[in-house]
Amino acid sequence: VDAAIEAGAKFIVSPGLNPKTVKYCQEKNIPILPGVATASEIEQALELGLDVVKFFPAEVNGGLPAIKALSAPYHMMQFMPTGGVNPQNVKEYLSFDKVLACGGTWMVKDALINAGEFDKIKEMTREAIELVTE
């Protein structure tokens, strides 16, 4: 967490819900979106004072139907699905009012970052924005 903050991160996203990490981020006043996939993990997130979580891995855990089902009893929670989100399903996810944002490795590949191909990353980012604003 400290390395991310020192590098300029404005928020933290993690694959799972670690209460120690959440509390540390809260002490540092940095928003955190821990990964959850079950009602029990959402209960933990609520207990920690969170109202936005990463739903991960989204497609493996039922995708948008699962988010909708979890949203019924946890109407105060918002979700950021990642894991299996792609150009074909991102608009469907974003059409649900409990989905705050989506993440996907299809938008920025490690190889492009490592190669310093930031113009290509900019182009892919523009394409992703166009995809969801059509």
Please name every model-derived segment.
Residues V1-A7, S40-L48, A72, V85-A101:
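Catalytic cores of alpha/beta
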Residues V1-D2, G8-L17, P31-T38, I42, ...:
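Catalytic beta/alpha-barrel core
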Residues F11, P15-T21, K54-L64, K98-K120:
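Glycine-rich phosphate-binding active-site loops on the catalytic face of alpha/beta enzymes
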Residues T21, C25, E41:
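Aromatic/hydrophobic pocket-lining residues that form π-stacking "cages" and hydrophobic walls in ligand
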Residues C25-I30, A111-E134:
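C-terminal helical cap(s) of enzyme catalytic domains, especially alpha/beta-barrels
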Residues N29, M76, K98-V99:
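A generic structural signal for alpha->beta connector loops
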Residues G49-K54, A66-L70, H75-M76:
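A contiguous pocket-lining binding segment that forms or flanks enzyme active sites
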Residues K68-A69, K91, R126:
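Active-site phosphate/pyrophosphate- and oxyanion-stabilizing loops and adjacent acidic/basic residues
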